[in-house]
Amino acid sequence: MIYAIVALIGFSAKMGCFEVAGERYTERLRAMVFRAFLKQEIGYYDEDDHSVGALTTRLALDSKNVNELVTKVAGDVVEIIATAITGLVIAFVYDWRITLITLAFSPFIMGASFYESKIQRGFEDETAKAHEYSGEVAGEAIKEIRTVAALGKQGYFEAKYRRATNRPHRLAKRKAYLSSIGYALNQGVILYVGAAAFYAGMKFIEQRVIDFDDLFVSLLSVMITVHGIGRASVFASTYGKAKNSAIATFEILERQSKIDPDLEGIETDTSKIAGDLSFENITFRYPARPDIPIFDGDFNLEGKAGQTIALVGPSGCGKSTAIGMLQRWYDPVDGVVRLDEHNTKNFSLHNLRSHMSLVGQEPVLFDMTIGENIRFGVDEGKQVTQQEVEDAARAANIHKFIIDLPDGYDTRVGDKGSQLSGGQKQRIAIARALIRKPKVLLLDEATSALDSESEKLVQQAIDNIISEGGRTTLTIAHRLSTIQTADLICVVKNGRIVEKGTHWELLKLDAEYAALVRQQSLNADH
């Protein structure tokens, strides 16, 4: 009775304490891993092993597996140790002979448990990688569901996902077959030990060495101990998964970002930034494609404060890469990128990017209201008035559309801005960029994905912004009609600038730029 009461209290305390501790640890661990993901440089996400699906799967599963290590494995270890010590003490007190006979078989019990646990752990690495890949496939399909639906490729992704999940299924079956043998061996040894101890006990009773009561208590205590030790193999699989997850988790926690956002550097107020830009003898290769040079030491560009600088050229020549290096998504292998004569590496990362705003080809809006999306462009801690939001929207040529909506600026845009057209999303993205009051505005083919009517509205907004002055604009343009008024047009080819000048100066050269103009059937006399 006393043993039962103590066990009741002990098991309850164990379950409660370890579950609470595990949940608290998991919450902190997930937050730490997510923070570590956000600190990594952009090149980290270019690697195949670091796709959205793989990372989100790891974020969900690794923390869960480590949680099981804390709640189940650690709790079971404490329980087994406590049970073993208590059981052996009781068994020795009531009859040391039965206890010693049972302990003589302990190497066989431990061997069977080790065999089963080895089988359990042996599949964990392969299974974890297989689950990551299946998560990657699912993430890709769901993320691009509109494209998948438009192309009618649901069947393709269903088959691909089925193949991806088939591997962990096959591994699970192999594991089940082998584990069944290990489990049977483990339990068989335990039962054999119990039978041997009981047989010896009956012989001792016949010889009047012990009485039945002492045999019963001693045998029961030692068998509880043996069963507890035998259970060690049960959580071997949990331990294996948790170990692999812990290794992966601490790899990301301990990984030092190549472009660390927490490093200190120049902290300059935006009002003191002029907006001069320069790229000097840049050499660059993407970390995920080190064998393919983008810039080979010959990329040089200088832009003065207040200028509009346009980069044109064929796809893959490095135009967007230049913008990425200016924002320090990537650092050059060699050469220097400067903002106002300062190497961009000398700025703190947050301060550097606070002087810039980027509007990309595919505008990204978050699942919040229009007003919140625009305010999202301002650094945390800075107060933004509704008037400032509306002024930014007017400058982006989107204010009238917003106030005509039933909920106005409180209208939710949906996931990825799904409730809005491409042109509307782009103009809201421009408003978000403008509310930052940047000294450098970066436009990466901001109109190339729009229809003619939306392009006209967006381009009108961009022209108005440029005409205001007060900032340097670096724009990448596929449609040359949008950059004819730029102060400096640079033609990028094979990783270097082969021509630069105004629209008319480059037309007179009758070389690369003029060929691009003719290719787009642009009226050179316009």
Predicted regions and their residues:
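Cytosolic ends of transmembrane helices, especially the final helix of ABC transmembrane type-1 domains
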Residues: 23, 150-153, 177, 218, ...
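Conserved catalytic Walker-motif region of ABC-type ATPase nucleotide-binding domains
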Residues: 161, 249, 279-281
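An intracellular "coupling" helix at the cytosolic face of ABC transporter transmembrane type-1 domains
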Residues: 61-70, 74, 119-140, 149-197, ...
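Transmembrane-helix motif of ABC transporter permease domains
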Residues: 1-27, 47, 111-112, 173, ...
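Short intracellular "coupling" helices and adjacent cytoplasmic loop segments at the cytosolic face
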Residues: 23, 31-57, 63, 137-160, ...
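ABC-type nucleotide-binding domain
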Residues: 270-526
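Transmembrane helices of ABC transporter permease
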Residues: 76-125, 199, 203-210
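Hydrophobic alpha-helical membrane-associated segments
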Residues: 6-22, 105-119, 145-146, 197, ...
